[in-house]
């Protein structure tokens, strides 16, 4: 039985990861760092910006200028303003779901709120929004998901996590929650390889049109 549904944001509710990846690849190329979209997906997907920057510094020995983050975020939000979309059928799912739900994202509060606003989901940027800034350890640690459960007074075993990234799946597994992997984002290759050990979801689905087919009890009865 599920009492709380926890949605990731980027790559689940909104089709943002492909835009973010392309912008990061381009920004780092300006400093002589050559990575591709596959590298971003394998190493950075589902992680917070500070964690990503820490790994870049460690792996490439690169000290980015103090204004790099501000400039990257400004370019990213400009790209979001013209290209960000909500995942198909997400709005319908959020309107019909019959239990408490929230969002748990590695994005900053400002970016998450702005992104949700761009796709008409600004009403979710209040108490339903939980970000990595609220916990000591971000994904793949379970801290953020466990915080969601705690704030809702829900047993983690009765929580359902909807994730796209391996790090998010790992976090959900570590939290002792049921995890469904959404594979319909533009950033994920088709066909998608099997997940490695330690990052196995309980179920997969590639469109929110079939979300309630996976467990009809999640849908509000009319």
Locations of regions flagged by a protein language model:
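Active-site neighborhood of HAD-like aspartate-dependent phosphohydrolases
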Residues: 1-41
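Conserved SAM-binding loop
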Residues: 13, 86, 101, 161-162
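Short helix-capping segments at alpha-helix termini
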Residues: 30-34, 60-63, 120-124, 153-154
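Metal-dependent phosphoesterase signature
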Residues: 54-92
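Short glycine/proline-enriched coil/turn segments at helix->beta-strand junctions
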Residues: 58, 96-101, 176-177
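Asp-based, Mg2+/Mn2+-dependent phosphohydrolase catalytic module
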Residues: 1-3, 95, 108-222
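Short, acidic loop-to-helix structural element flanking the phosphoryl-transfer center
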Residues: 78-103, 109-113
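Helix-loop "lid/cap" segments that line or gate small-molecule binding pockets
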Residues: 27-28, 48-63, 115, 149
């Amino acid at each position: 039985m599920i009492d709380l549904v926890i949605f990731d944001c980027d790559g689940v509710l909104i089709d943002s990861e492909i835009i973010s990846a392309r912008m990061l690849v381009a920004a780092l190329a300006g400093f002589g760092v050559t990575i591709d979209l596959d590298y971003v997906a394998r190493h950075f997907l589902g992680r917070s910006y500070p964690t990503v920057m820490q790994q870049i510094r460690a792996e490439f020995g690169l000290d980015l200028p103090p204004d790099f983050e501000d400039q990257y975020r400004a370019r990213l939000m400009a790209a979001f303003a013209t290209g960000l979309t909500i995942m198909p059928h997400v709005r319908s799912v959020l309107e019909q779901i019959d239990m408490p739900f929230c969002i748990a994202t590695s994005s900053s509060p400002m970016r998450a709120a702005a992104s949700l606003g761009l796709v008409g989901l600004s009403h979710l940027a209040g108490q339903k929004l939980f970000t990595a800034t609220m916990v000591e350890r971000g994904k793949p640690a379970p801290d953020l998901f466990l915080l969601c459960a705690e704030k809702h007074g829900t047993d983690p075993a009765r929580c359902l996590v909807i994730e796209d990234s391996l790090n998010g799946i790992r976090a959900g597994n570590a939290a002792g929650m049921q995890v469904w992997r959404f594979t319909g984002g533009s950033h994920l290759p088709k066909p998608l390889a099997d997940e490695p050990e330690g990052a196995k979801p309980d179920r997969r689905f590639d469109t929110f049109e079939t979300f309630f087919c996976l467990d009809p009890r999640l849908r509000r009865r009319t």
